[in-house]
Amino acid sequence: MNSIDPRAIIDPSAKLADGVEVGPWSIVGPDVEIGEGTVIGPHVVLKGPTRIGKHNRIYQFSSIGEDTPDLKYKGEPTRLVIGDHNVIREGVTIHRGTVQDRAETTLGDHNLIMAYAHIGHDSVIGNHCILVNNTALAGHVHVGDWAILSGFTLVHQYCHIGAHAFSGMGTAIGKDVPAFVTVFGSPAEARSMNFEGMRRRGFSDEVIHALRRSYKIVYRQGLTVEEAVKELDELAGKHPEVDLFRQSIVNSARGITR
């Protein structure tokens, strides 16, 4: 059974599964779907086409699924897709996609999006990510699983943040960040790898040692990117985690943060 505050506005075309809660003065617009057990707080605006999965919680003053401010956007049908078990805190803004890219913005599962963060059009956020307060992603940004972006991190459009990467507070990211790499500063510079995150997630000492060696190859031996990638081949063949690091470098379109 749903719990809809009488002061909320629900469009007749919106689809709400069982167990959905909607707080006072929230607006659920046309072509919005909300999955089972999701809780929408007060003063939330949901605009479609937007699909929200199960057991999410969205806090007050968030604007979810609004049109992109991209000047190329002319009202074409685009959408936002949000997975399951996400927490979206106060004042978060997430825009739908554009037809010039995927026509979709995607947020995966088990993410924590903290207060006043922004996720721009056509961005893709993986699973188990944390975007700390006031983090802002421009359009077309990709964030890999388990990445953590500290408060006031800014990410340039089209940048890719690799899985398990970490940014320090106030970091300005203008190039791709390889998987596992920790970056700080404005502009961002690579400082180390997210070894603390690896330990918390149960990575073995052997894997952590291999990743430490891999980081030194790329960042400490004075090699070109092409030379470093070749040097990583042997370790990547032994450890999938090193291969993930290597592939995030190989697939970089903007160049990697160094």
UniProtKB/Swiss-Prot annotation:
The pathway where this protein functions is: Glycolipid biosynthesis; lipid IV(A) biosynthesis; lipid IV(A) from (3R)-3-hydroxytetradecanoyl-[acyl-carrier-protein] and UDP-N-acetyl-alpha-D-glucosamine: step 1/6
Q: Where is the signal peptide?
A: none
Places the protein is found: Cytoplasm
Does the record bear Cell cycle in its keywords? no
Pfam families associated with the record: Acetyltransf_11 (PF13720), Hexapep (PF00132)
Q: Does the keyword Cytoplasm apply?
A: yes
The subunit field of the Swiss-Prot or TrEMBL record says: Homotrimer.
Its annotated function is as follows: Involved in the biosynthesis of lipid A, a phosphorylated glycolipid that anchors the lipopolysaccharide to the outer membrane of the cell.
Q: What is this protein called?
A: Acyl-[acyl-carrier-protein]--UDP-N-acetylglucosamine O-acyltransferase
